[in-house]
Swiss-Prot record:
Keyword Disulfide bond annotated: yes
Domain of life assignment: Eukaryota
UniProt-recorded name of the protein: RPE-retinal G protein-coupled receptor
GO cellular component, one term: plasma membrane
PTM text: Covalently binds all-trans- and 11-cis-retinal.
Function: Receptor for all-trans- and 11-cis-retinal. Binds preferentially to the former and may catalyze the isomerization of the chromophore by a retinochrome-like mechanism.
Length: 291
């Protein structure tokens, strides 16, 4: 079990403060944008559709990632982990579960868009709700396995936040890593890529794509790919040769995904923007309804 400890060698207080500042900016940005998305969905009846339920689920997952980053930011600014061993396990579980829900949620949105635009059938509630439940139950299941001994949660290199421990590189870690990564990274990445690929093929003749078909897959790969590469390296080599500062880069990149997802999947869409504006301008919205 993890225990409270001092800063690791090779990291000064100023560098930990810099990490904490970056995490704080990422956390506040993700919470604000995804919170606005969730608020607009809850307050605007036009947005309460099965397809938008998938986007709402993604926003909830990304809010969870941002809340996890906020805890890490505060701990980094304190330059210590103040929540003890059990707090580390909870922090690791919550961060891992919401990260998996975000990755799989992105794939669910991609499949939902393919279903909507390529099958000429509206996504039904009796399909969207089980899909969202599956995403969250699957993510919670995989995140709970390290608590039961398959994998392990421990401190990240700065020692002020917790994640899946990759420093051991033993058989237990390797077996969990490759199994988990196949079902929770490679499969969602494949679903995302093929869904948007089929959409490109369907709309290639008209030349008009209803959504951006290249950005979601690239962002999924660029946002979570560095983490995957770090874990892969840890499985085949001694990760201690990589400096703690460099090991923190994938985590900082991944924490930008809530902001990117909020902009890409929700806030740039005309209907969501209109719903958000109605929520922020209640007097104007009331006036419009009375006319």
């Amino acid at each position: 079990m993890a225990a409270t400890r001092a800063l690791p060698a090779g990291l000064g207080e100023l560098e930990v403060l810099a990490v904490g500042t970056v995490l704080l900016m990422e956390a506040l940005s993700g919470i604000s944008l995804n919170g606005l998305t969730i608020f607009s969905f809850c307050k605007t009846p036009d947005l309460r559709t099965p397809s938008n339920l998938l986007v709402l689920s993604l926003a909830l997952a990304d809010t969870g990632i941002s809340l996890n980053a906020l805890v890490a930011a505060v701990s980094s600014l304190l330059r210590r982990w103040p929540h003890g061993s059990e707090g580390c396990q909870v922090h690791g579980f919550q961060g891992f579960a919401t990260a998996l829900a975000s990755i799989c949620g992105s794939a669910a949105v991609a499949w939902g868009r393919y279903h909507h635009y390529c099958t000429r059938r509206q996504l039904a509630w009796d399909t969207a709700i089980p899909l969202v439940l599956f995403v969250w139950m699957s993510s919670a299941f995989w995140a709970s396995l390290p608590l039961m001994g398959w994998g392990h949660y421990d401190y990240e290199p700065v020692g002020t936040c917790c994640t899946l421990d990759y420093s051991r590189g033993d058989r237990n870690f390797i077996s969990f890593l490759f199994t988990m990564a196949f079902f929770n990274f490679l499969v969602p990445l494949f679903i995302t890529h093929t869904s948007y690929r089929f959409m490109e093929q369907k709309f290639s003749r008209s030349g008009h794509l209803p959504v951006n078909t290249t950005l979601p897959g690239r962002m999924l790969l660029l946002g979570w790919g560095p983490y995957a590469l770090l874990y892969l390296y840890a499985a085949i080599a001694d990760v201690s040769f990589i400096s703690p500062k460099l090991q923190m880069v994938p985590a900082l990149i991944a924490k930008t995904m809530p902001t990117i997802n909020a902009i890409n999947y929700a806030l740039h869409r005309e209907m969501v923007c209109r719903g958000t504006w109605q929520c922020l301008s209640p007097q104007k919205s009331k006036k419009d309804r009375t006319q």
